[in-house]
């Protein structure tokens, strides 16, 4: 019985991982669809589509899946029509939360997001109710093996980046929104494809959470991220290492 139970647990975890991977693929395909329709279907002349393809590489989406998504987005009929929507609100302990969505039904998505906030002790606010607490920036990440810290810093600053942070594992470059695509293209031509390249919301200050509040905030974020319409979730919290270890136990 123990072996059988262990097998069931392994299969349950694998099933959960497969479901999460499928949801992530669906989000990437939705972004490819919108970006392909927002300009030419050629990534060489469509910066947003290039960023979507970079996201697809980040999650190991097969190239033929990407190609089919682009073809479907720009073909006859073109399928679903998605609207870009941003929701803002407060979670437990006053944590500020930004939710970015692509939806074909605004009423459904708004109701789902509002329900998630309410269930976990938060409240959905008005547009711009919390975004003033964040900065919108471009983030480009390369593995440390792509080049030395000095080479990456020099190339990034020359290309117009705002900052570079290098560790033993990665180089992370931040840019303004306006310079993001240009900086990414320059660095990609020199160092190869980045591990990740996206626009991000970075908090100016963070809220430190105890174990109870951290658990509630993480549950809220999980529910939001598992929603098919939600593309990304950002929040201004910090969880101390000892609290994170206790939650993982």
From Swiss-Prot:
InterPro entries: Integrase-like_N, TACO1_YebC-like_2nd/3rd_dom, TACO1_YebC_N, Transcrip_reg_TACO1-like, Transcrip_reg_TACO1-like_dom3, YebC-like. The keyword Ligase does not apply. One of its GO terms (molecular function) is DNA binding. It is found in: Cytoplasm. Keywords: Cytoplasm, DNA-binding, Transcription, Transcription regulation. Pfam families: TACO1_YebC_N, Transcrip_reg. One of its GO terms (biological process) is regulation of DNA-templated transcription. The keyword Repressor does not apply. GO terms for cellular component: cytosol. Belongs to the TACO1 family. This is Probable transcriptional regulatory protein GbCGDNIH1_1097. It comes from Granulibacter bethesdensis (strain ATCC BAA-1260 / CGDNIH1).
